[in-house]
């Protein structure tokens, strides 16, 4: 492999979108609390109303692209957004502000005041601020398939046969593939299967994908912060098979990490997320 090849890191998935929506929902909560304290002027009230309308619309649209288990209401996102702010600002929610007595503490019976406090918020799901793991997570009984000296058709068939006989849940798929008997690449795929009533299993999410060269160096990395949902089983295999197409096109020179990344990202329409390559000539 060429020495000037650089590691290409790609981040794909709605993680940043979720974080942004949740943070803006936290801002909306702060606006509303300021309004309850009768401390928001007319322009501020107008911004509050516009932000609320924008968030309601954006959440409705975003939830359509999320699996049902991950869809959240505006109120749920407010709770997470407030916790994000507390993490970002190291804010102590029990600390008071000298010289300031909140209006709602003096007039708690007012109908505009909320009947909850900071400590009523549910815990933030998962890790704070969508932490991104650097390596595929360890999973019990990982799936491992080794492919050597197979043509694309046989390799694809073996993948399809093997992955559809595995148990439902998270898996890790390890593939070794020779390219012209010169270069072997190791591909780690972390994803999830769904089990249907008829016993058929389909690939529903792709958590992450790493590609290593024969020396163990990472040459391409796809991180799904909130997982990549694939529409159906055929779509899932199409994504995996595209890797073999990228790795087996008969290039006369070593395959570039950037080319591989573009090939994978194009399956999701996410080419714009490719990080700039430096020194990969």
Swiss-Prot record:
Name the keywords, alphabetized: Host cytoplasm, Host nucleus, Host-virus interaction, Inhibition of host innate immune response by virus, Inhibition of host interferon signaling pathway by virus, Inhibition of host ISG15 by virus, Inhibition of host PKR by virus, Interferon antiviral system evasion, RNA-binding, Viral immunoevasion
Q: Where in the cell is it found?
A: Host cytoplasm; Host nucleus
What SUPFAM superfamilies does the record tag this protein with?
S15/NS1 RNA-binding domain
Quaternary structure note = Homodimer. Interacts with and inhibits human G1P2 conjugation by UBE1L.
Q: What name appears for this protein in its UniProt entry?
A: Non-structural protein 1
Q: Which organism is it from?
A: Influenza B virus (strain B/Singapore/222/1979)
- Residues that span the membrane, as ranges: none
Matching Pfam families, A to Z? Flu_B_NS1 (PF02942)
Q: Which InterPro entries match?
A: NS1 (IPR004208), uS15_NS1_RNA-bd_sf (IPR009068)
**Entry function:** Binds and inhibits the conjugation of the ubiquitin-like G1P2/ISG15 protein to its target proteins. Since G1P2/ISG15 is an early antiviral protein, NS1 may inhibit the host antiviral response. Prevents EIF2AK2/PKR activation, either by binding double strand RNA or by interacting directly with EIF2AK2/PKR. Also binds poly(A) and U6 snRNA.
Judging by the UniProt lineage, the source's domain of life is Viruses
* Region annotated RNA-binding and homodimerization, chain positions: 1-93
Q: Which GO terms describe its biological process?
A: symbiont-mediated suppression of host ISG15-protein conjugation; symbiont-mediated suppression of host PKR/eIFalpha signaling; symbiont-mediated suppression of host type I interferon-mediated signaling pathway
Q: Which gene encodes it?
A: NS
Q: What is the lineage of its organism?
A: Viruses, Riboviria, Orthornavirae, Negarnaviricota, Polyploviricotina
Q: Mind listing the GO molecular function terms for this protein?
A: protein serine/threonine kinase inhibitor activity; RNA binding
One cellular component term from this protein's GO annotations in UniProt: host cell nucleus
């Amino acid at each position: 492999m060429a020495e000037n090849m650089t590691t290409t890191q790609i981040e794909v998935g709605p993680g940043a979108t979720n974080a942004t929506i949740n943070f803006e929902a936290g801002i909306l909560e702060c606006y509303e609390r300021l309004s309850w304290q009768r401390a928001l002027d007319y322009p501020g009230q107008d911004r509050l109303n516009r932000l609320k309308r924008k968030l309601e619309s954006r959440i409705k649209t975003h939830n359509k692209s999320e699996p049902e288990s991950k869809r959240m209401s505006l109120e749920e996102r407010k709770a997470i957004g407030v916790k994000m702010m507390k993490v970002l600002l190291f804010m102590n929610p029990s600390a008071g502000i000298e010289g300031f007595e909140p209006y709602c503490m003096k007039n708690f019976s007012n109908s505009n005041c909320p009947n909850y406090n900071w400590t009523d918020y549910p815990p933030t799901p998962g890790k704070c601020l969508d932490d991104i793991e650097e390596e595929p997570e360890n999973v019990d009984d990982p799936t491992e398939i080794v492919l050597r000296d197979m043509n694309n058709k046989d390799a694809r068939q073996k993948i399809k046969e093997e992955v559809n006989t595995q148990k439902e849940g998270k898996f890790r798929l390890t593939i070794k593939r020779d390219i012209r008997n010169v270069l072997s690449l190791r591909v780690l795929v972390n994803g999830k299967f769904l089990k249907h009533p008829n016993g058929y299993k389909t690939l529903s999410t792709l958590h992450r994908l790493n590609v290593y060269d024969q020396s163990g160096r990472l040459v391409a990395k796809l991180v799904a912060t909130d997982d990549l949902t694939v529409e159906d089983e055929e779509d899932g295999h199409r994504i995996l098979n595209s890797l073999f197409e990228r790795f087996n096109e008969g290039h006369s020179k070593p395959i570039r990490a950037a080319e591989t990344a573009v090939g994978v990202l194009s399956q999701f329409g996410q080419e714009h997320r490719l990080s700039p390559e430096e020194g990969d000539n």
